[in-house]
A protein has these predicted regions:
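Terminal and linker regions of secretory-pathway proteins
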Residues: 2-346
């Protein structure tokens, strides 16, 4: 998405800033010791930016915002955006972080509802090839299993880098395609407890993508149940394409006019008149809940990045179209039954 180059340019500027200023801390070279670009308020917590080396060639970028309350005792939350291939810095700077880009992108404003009010939050850019995460050999081909393994290694490396957090309560969180990543990751954590103890307390996923067949099918039913699709189109899909019952209909195998009708229903959520994340919320002419106008602002900072052109090509908030071939979506159910007793608190 072109509009995300706004944020990309900001993070490149942030990277340059980090290169020159972050390492001034004598206690931790990853600590951010100077004021962030565009920040318009005073911080009352420590924050960090650095890398977690998970193999000889792979380095995952992370940012940590310490709890404002009691970082020694408050929970540690790991956050992952979805995609697959979306940078978790989107979560940091546009959703739940302590500093958010304002509407026109001119400054970073304080978020009164930041998750780090009562928890230390770790934003990990995963898999390698997303954001500032990289592989020295250029091999960032991945799939769901590789991503889960890499995320587990990253979390273990985090606790080795920050052993003071090892006894804190831990929560694994994310959104969207994290519905695939995180149950797999949590399963690895549970199975690895005997070798690497993590004080896991919970898993939370917003708007999760859990199972392709179920998610796609439920979208059709949701659209009809909320009056998004007209009766004639619905009856056509139901009777002519799904043998009278949409529940259990294998939508992916539909062809011809049936496939076109299903696509038409899905497109009803992206026609610019409906907010796909909350149909009761007005989003004007925007096709989704967020306004991306602010992302254009950082294109005006390009003159400060002339010597970082190479990095600019590598840094990505989303895996772009030319890179999708590197990410294999397994698209099955990711839920491991062994997680049930863990999530039930047993």
């Amino acid at each position: 998405m072109q509009n995300f180059y706004f944020l990309i340019n900001y993070f490149i500027l942030l990277f340059i800033f980090a290169k020159n200023n972050f390492a001034q801390s004598q206690n931790n070279p990853d600590e951010i010791t100077d004021k962030l670009p565009l920040l318009d308020f005073k911080l009352n917590f420590k924050h960090y930016s650095g890398y977690l080396q998970i193999s000889k060639t792979k380095f995952l970028h992370y940012m940590l915002t310490n709890s404002k309350n009691n970082p020694e005792k408050d929970p540690v939350i790991f956050w992952y955006n979805g995609g697959p291939g979306c940078s978790s810095l989107l979560g940091l700077f546009t959703e739940l972080g302590p500093y958010l880009l304002n509407k026109d992108g001119s400054k970073l404003i304080e978020n009164p509802h930041s998750w780090n009010n009562n928890a230390s939050v770790v934003f990990i850019e995963s898999p390698a090839g997303v954001g500032f995460s990289y592989a020295t050999d250029g091999n960032v081909a991945t799939n769901d299993n590789i991503a889960a393994d890499d995320n587990y290694l990253a979390i273990k490396q985090f606790f080795k880098k920050y052993p003071k957090f090892i006894k804190n309560d831990v929560y694994i969180t994310g959104e969207s395609y994290a519905g695939i990543y995180l149950p797999m990751l949590t399963s690895l954590i549970v199975k690895g407890m005997s070798k690497f103890k993590i004080n896991l307390k919970g898993l939370a996923i917003g708007n999760p993508y859990l199972n392709k067949k179920i998610d796609y099918e439920s979208n059709l039913i949701y659209a009809y149940g909320h009056g998004v699709v007209d009766e004639e189109l619905w009856q056509s899909v139901k009777k002519d394409c799904c043998k009278g019952c949409v529940e259990g209909c294998d939508i992916e195998k539909l062809t011809g006019i049936c496939s076109n009708n299903v696509i038409q229903i899905y497109n009803s959520f992206s026609n610019g008149n409906i907010n796909p994340y909350d149909i009761y919320r007005n989003c004007g002419n925007s096709p989704n809940a967020s306004s991306y106008q602010k992302y254009d602002m950082f294109s005006r900072a390009a003159f400060r990045l002339k010597n970082m052109a190479k990095l600019a090509k590598k840094a990505k908030l989303n895996i772009m179209e030319e890179d999708t071939r590197r990410v294999k979506r397994d698209d099955g159910s990711s839920f491991d039954p062994s997680l049930v007793p863990c999530l039930a608190g047993k």
